[in-house]
Amino acid sequence: MALNIEDKKAVVEEVSAIIAEAGSMVAAEYRGLTVEQLTELRSKAREANVSVRVVKNTLVRRAVAGTKFEDMAETFSGPLIFAFSGEELGNAARVFKDFSKANEALVVKSLSIGEGVMDASQLAAIAALPTYDEALSKLLYVMKEPVAKVARGLVAIKEQKEAEAA
């Protein structure tokens, strides 16, 4: 069903609002996926706090114009599904990567984190990015470990001096 001009403007505004909040964007061709598979993909994306939309390419081109994802517009061709991640930049890539393992019909065309376009070959690297919580826990471990080593060293010196005194 064709959209009238007001509906198209509303879709562009809606997608523009999503893009304004997004930290990363993934575009993938979904040709060959069944409705059930698309529903499953949307469900997994929702669980990962990823916004997934199927929108006409021309409308998405208008929505990305003037944004950090503007360079991706040249890769928009064919039936595409778009995913947008908020704070967790790797979530959209992670959802599409995991889903495409079981469903080869989903083919990632391009992705972007901030400015610049990456091709599908870099999907695995982006999907491997740690989540915010994982990165924070690794940072805290790195900060805590030297202090713990010093404390263990001081305890060892104390025990050694006590043993010598006894």
From Swiss-Prot:
Entry keywords, A to Z: Ribonucleoprotein, Ribosomal protein, RNA-binding, rRNA-binding
Sample GO molecular function, one term: structural constituent of ribosome
Entry-linked SUPFAM superfamilies: Ribosomal protein L10-like
Record GO cellular component, one term: large ribosomal subunit
GO biological process, one term: translation
Family matches, as Pfam families: Ribosomal_L10
Signal peptide range in chain numbering: none
Protein's job: Forms part of the ribosomal stalk, playing a central role in the interaction of the ribosome with GTP-bound translation factors.
Subunit text: Part of the ribosomal stalk of the 50S ribosomal subunit. The N-terminus interacts with L11 and the large rRNA to form the base of the stalk. The C-terminus forms an elongated spine to which L12 dimers bind in a sequential fashion forming a multimeric L10(L12)X complex.
Protein family per UniProt: Belongs to the universal ribosomal protein uL10 family.
PANTHER family for this protein: 39S RIBOSOMAL PROTEIN L10, MITOCHONDRIAL
The name this protein goes by in its record: Large ribosomal subunit protein uL10
Gene this protein is translated from: rplJ
